[in-house]
A protein has these predicted regions:
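Acidic/aromatic-lined carbohydrate-recognition and catalytic surfaces
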Residues: 1-110, 149-170
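Active-site-proximal helices and loops of the catalytic beta/alpha 8
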Residues: 3-7, 14-15, 36-38, 44, ...
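Short clusters of hydrophobic/aromatic residues that line enzyme substrate/ligand-binding pockets
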Residues: 19-22, 116, 193
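Short flexible/disordered coil segments
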Residues: 56-67, 113-116, 166, 205-213, ...
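Short, mixed-charge, low-aromatic patches
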Residues: 82-87, 109-117, 210-215
């Protein structure tokens, strides 16, 4: 999980409220540290799920203050994108006389939480401190960036460099050409999930047409980008829900 969430019910961790508190639905921070240490002792690295596109709040605009190593970090209403939540946040901000960022979202809007303005120096400082904490304090050896379609790819490169991390993968769920563009826009500082190959395998299995496995419309068959391809199998986004869904 990316950090402690606000909800009292079990959650997968995609609604982060705290960054520097790692107690979660999966266990305590102490248990997490023991797990990472045990894996490391066995020569296995652990990848953190980094959710920084959006952030939960109390009410519309209140972020928690967190103190780590003597420094207090707190996101502000001015760190929220100007067009967050399809403009609903701006309407509420006007009603409460609250100032948002003047910058629109750099990518896709994610409704339900406050989308962060990654051009904000405060946002950048907090996230850089957070990813350093994940690597240097908790002991993670890699990052999986959630919802990277929501902010510019260049920020992933900046955060990786700030942490000194050796491996990261972005969840850029789109066509092969757009995934390739995203990798290029990170300056080839991150890998990406090879979602197109996942669909090649799905279609081959569903239709009994195994020649689809020879498709070159994926990252793994691109000689210049295959080193940045991470095979994607399945997750909670693709689980079976009803006969009408074909994910």
């Amino acid at each position: 999980q990316s950090g402690k969430c606000l909800e009292t019910y079990q959650t997968m961790g995609y609604t982060p409220y705290y960054y520097f508190n790692q107690n979660s639905s999966f266990g305590t921070e102490s248990e997490l540290r023991d797990l990472i240490s045990s894996f490391k002792a066995a020569g296995i690295g652990t990848v953190a799920d980094v959710v920084v596109n959006h952030h939960n709040t109390t009410g519309w605009f209140t972020f928690p203050a967190e103190t780590y190593k003597g420094v207090t970090y707190q996101l502000l209403p001015t760190d929220i994108t100007a067009n967050d939540d399809g403009g609903k946040t701006a309407l509420e901000a006007a009603r409460q006389d609250v100032a948002l960022s003047t910058n629109n979202d750099e990518g896709e809007d994610w409704g339900g939480m406050r989308d962060l303005d990654h051009k904000s120096q405060n946002v950048q400082n907090i996230i850089k401190a957070y990813v350093r904490y994940l690597k240097d304090d908790l002991g993670y050896t890699g990052f999986r960036y959630d919802m990277v379609k929501g902010f510019a790819a260049s920020h992933v490169a900046d955060y990786n460099k700030a942490a000194g991390i050796e491996f990261s993968v972005g969840e850029y769920w789109d066509s092969n050409a757009n995934i390739q563009s995203w990798i290029e826009n990170t300056g080839k500082n991150s890998a990406a999930f090879d979602f197109q190959f996942r669909y090649n395998v799905r279609d081959a299995a569903n239709g009994g047409n195994w020649t689809l496995l020879n498709s070159t419309n994926n990252l793994m068959h691109d000689a210049t980008l295959r080193q940045y391809a991470v095979t994607f199998v399945e997750n909670h986004d693709t689980q079976y829900r009803s006969p009408s869904e074909t994910g």
